[in-house]
UniProtKB/Swiss-Prot annotation:
It catalyses: (S)-2,3,4,5-tetrahydrodipicolinate + succinyl-CoA + H2O = (S)-2-succinylamino-6-oxoheptanedioate + CoA. GO terms for molecular function: 2,3,4,5-tetrahydropyridine-2,6-dicarboxylate N-succinyltransferase activity; nucleotidyltransferase activity. Pfam families: Hexapep_2, THDPS_N_2. One of its GO terms (cellular component) is cytoplasm. It comes from Azoarcus sp. (strain BH72). This is 2,3,4,5-tetrahydropyridine-2,6-dicarboxylate N-succinyltransferase. Transmembrane segments: none annotated. It is found in: Cytoplasm. InterPro entries: DapD_Trfase_Hexpep_rpt_fam (IPR005664), Hexapep (IPR001451), Hexapep_transf_CS (IPR018357), THP_succinylTrfase_dom1 (IPR023180), THP_succinylTrfase_N_sf (IPR037133), Trimer_LpxA-like_sf (IPR011004).
Length: 273
């Protein structure tokens, strides 16, 4: 693995010289191995180690290099033609591969090659980008998008129209991470490497980026970039310092433990906010 990483790191430093017509075989093979690992779930852009999320920057570099090594080509899909550098994940799947994968793909859902879809995942008509990891039992509902390199945990529900942002550049930036058992309400957006910790609930229409204030009404504290475990979050606003206007924020209205979260319906948690 260290040899593979070194090839990718060195190639990224010299990426301006790479093209479909000019790239060493070792670089092509290394990039292909990384994309195949992402596709199979054996490699991940980010993984949790000792309770902390660690970003594998070299894997993001491999994804970026892959764009330089391929020309756009016609990609047929269901009677339509598309023109892109990255093939679709399921374009050459056999019935046996779908059975082995153990997930459902409802037309016209699209996942790109280099994304991982685990067992018991349901992809309603949705989109999953390269480098993304969607873990077991997760529902990606209609018109939801999972951006490049986003990490989605087990038993997550991404409701209709949810946008999970992608982060490829800058390389050092972390991806959006949605941990296990999180519910993200319809039309919500989580972008810019924000982390939603396990068992959290986001109501419909919550928008969170790195500059979004996350206000905890119990403590009065304001944080950025991370929603704590078990938090129930709704859209809200905070007054300006001069009191002349208000600006959008996300409001933590309560926190629940895993047991309460498992036993309580989403609507019940959100009522009375």
């Amino acid at each position: 693995m260290q040899d593979l990483q070194k090839i990718i790191d060195d190639a990224f430093e010299n990426r301006a010289s790479l093209s479909p017509a000019a790239a060493p075989a070792a670089v092509r093979d290394a990039v292909a191995e990384v994309i195949a690992g992402l596709d199979a779930g054996t490699l991940r852009v980010a993984e949790k180690k000792d309770g902390q999320w660690v970003v594998n920057q070299w894997i993001k570099k491999a994804v970026l290099i892959s764009f330089r090594l391929r020309d756009n080509e016609v990609i047929p899909a269901g009677g339509l033609n598309f023109f892109d550098k990255v093939p679709t994940k399921f374009g050459d799947y056999t019935p046996e591969q779908f059975q082995q994968g153990g997930f459902r793909v409802v037309p016209p859902a699209v996942a790109r090659k280099g994304s991982y879809i685990a067992k018991n995942v349901v992809l309603m008509p949705s989109y999953v980008n390269i480098g993304a990891y969607v873990d077991e039992g997760t529902m990606v509902d209609t018109w939801a998008t999972v951006g490049s390199c986003a990490q989605i945990g087990k038993n997550v529900h991404l409701s209709g129209g949810v946008g999970i942002g992608g982060v490829l550049e800058p390389v050092q930036a972390g991806p959006v991470i949605i941990e296990d058992n999180v519910f993200v309400g319809a039309r919500s957006e989580v972008v810019e490497g924000v982390i939603i910790e396990e068992n959290a609930v986001l109501s419909m229409g919550v928008y969170i980026g790195q500059s979004t204030k996350i206000y905890d009404r119990e403590t009065g504290s304001i944080t950025y970039g991370r929603v704590p475990a078990g938090a129930v979050v709704v859209p809200g606003s905070l007054p300006s310092a001069d009191g002349k206007y208000s600006l959008y924020c996300a409001v933590i209205v309560k926190k629940v433990d895993a047991q309460t979260r498992a036993k309580t319906g989403i609507n019940e948690l959100l009522r009375g906010a």
